[in-house]
Structures are given as structure tokens and as C-alpha cells.
């Protein structure tokens, strides 16, 4: 685990069948720590993780990862997009969110269907968060865009997308937001000029 930005921690898991890491994130708020798509943690990193852990946000059905363990050990609530809830069965989702909602007063929900019906992105709104304001805006993405090949942006294999056309139509929406940092739950994060890089990628998709 490492602190990738002030008050924002990341850790990951590596799998032999894919060339990119699976990343989770922890954002420290005044009222507690919010996790995004958390993979398994080494016991030593459990001790480092800022407490209390109040919330786990899942961006899509395939990113449950270790969410249940965080709920069991810390009593964290699990949140997902309202159009994705049925995709998690038999996992119980504690609260649902939709386009425009704020989680913990600062994480803005962006609905990005295509990979799955209710995938969400999370925008750490600079209006409500000092670090995001200082960094020029921070965006978290689950599977809508991944950091592969390393150092570049890409999509997951098309056979894993419910509706590739819908996903391509959803992606321009994130360009309505101002961000310079892109923290990806699959693959390498982009720590500078992220919006420009996303804009160029979206244009290439057509």
C-alpha cells in the first residue's frame, strides 16, 4: 500500500492471466475512509489503512473483490449504482446511488453504462475536497477505461463488454468534468494531464 496523493492510498493485485494490476483506492475523509473496488490486502497493510472504514464503493459487478471482508471486519456499508444492483446477486448492496449523487459529501457519481448496465465512475469534486482542488480534479474509473497497455489507455476485451457501442457513447460524458488525475482500478493511473489524454483516447474510439 502506498499514499499516491495526500489522503489517497492505493494497493493492488497481480494476476498471471492479465498484463495489468487490479487496483483499489482508499480516500480519507473527516468522517472516515471510503474504499473503491478494494482488492485483497496483506495483513500488514490492514494495519496501515486509515480507520474507521465506513464505505466501500463498487464501480461494477466484476469489482466486488474483497468488499465483503471489509464489511465483515469493519462494518462498512457497500454502495453501487442503482442500475447495477441486480448484477451483484447474491451479494447484498447496502445503498444505491445514481447519476449526480454525492457520496460522503465529495465523491460525485457518474453513470457510464456499456461494460455493464450500471457501471459508475467517481469524481472527487474539487468544490468539496481540498486535495482534488489542488490537483486540478481527480477521477476514479472502474472498467470503463483501463491503463493498458502500460503508459496508455485502453478498453477491456470486447467480449467482456455488454454493449461496446453504449460504452463508447458514454465515455464523452466524463469530459464534462475537470480533472488532471485519473486513478484507474485496472492498470496504471495517470497522474498528470489526464483529461487531455482521455480526450485523445475518446476521439480515437470515434
Residue ranges and their predicted role:
Residues 39-105:
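Active-site HxH/HxHxD metal-binding segment of metal-dependent hydrolases
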